[in-house]
């Protein structure tokens, strides 16, 4: 569907911004999981420094996502996601002010098409590899159809996540230059 929208020249800006938002939210969930089982310290396994390192240099600066200990106690993953997404929006808005809406919409289409095509081709290769390997599972007394179905769903979800993550990273790191530059 997204590929068809791109090829038809449709505006994919809302979808690209949603991909950026979802990619950020996914990373925040990984680095800042809330442990509801540990009611006294649900943040004990947070890796805020790891999250900062992941985005440092292309979305964050040294002064971003710095919290005092008392602030960390009240900090919620949603707030961190909102902060990161606001930075992403700022990058996109500044680019649009500098280069114009038409160029930015074309950039979004090109980046999205490249990522969808690349990830889809990788997915097809991985599915062929899964199909070859699934036959061996029948020897392990596992139903190959069930195994194939479960793994193929997981692989498809991983492909979608990779499209989101790569599109977000490319949209936020690509550098455009004017003819004067």
Question: What are the residue ranges of the model-derived segments?
Answer:
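Extended, charged helical/alpha-beta scaffold domains that provide interaction surfaces
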Residues: 1-181
């Amino acid at each position: 569907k997204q590929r068809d929208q791109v090829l038809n020249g449709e505006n994919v800006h809302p979808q690209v911004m949603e991909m950026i938002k979802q990619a950020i939210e996914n990373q925040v969930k990984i680095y800042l999981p809330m442990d509801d089982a540990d009611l006294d310290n649900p943040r004990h396994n947070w890796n805020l420094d790891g999250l900062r390192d992941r985005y440092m240099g292309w979305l964050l600066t040294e002064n971003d996502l710095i919290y005092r200990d008392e602030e960390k106690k009240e900090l919620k993953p949603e707030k961190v996601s909102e902060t990161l997404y606001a930075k992403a929006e700022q990058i996109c808005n500044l680019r649009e002010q500098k280069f114009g809406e038409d160029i930015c919409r074309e950039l979004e289409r090109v980046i999205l098409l490249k990522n969808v095509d690349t990830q889809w081709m990788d997915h097809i290769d991985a599915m062929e590899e899964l199909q070859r390997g699934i036959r061996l599972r029948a020897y392990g007394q596992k139903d190959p159809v069930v195994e194939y179905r479960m793994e193929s769903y997981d692989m498809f979800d991983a492909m979608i996540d990779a499209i989101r993550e790569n599109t977000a990273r490319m949209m936020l790191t690509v550098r455009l230059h004017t003819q004067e530059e």
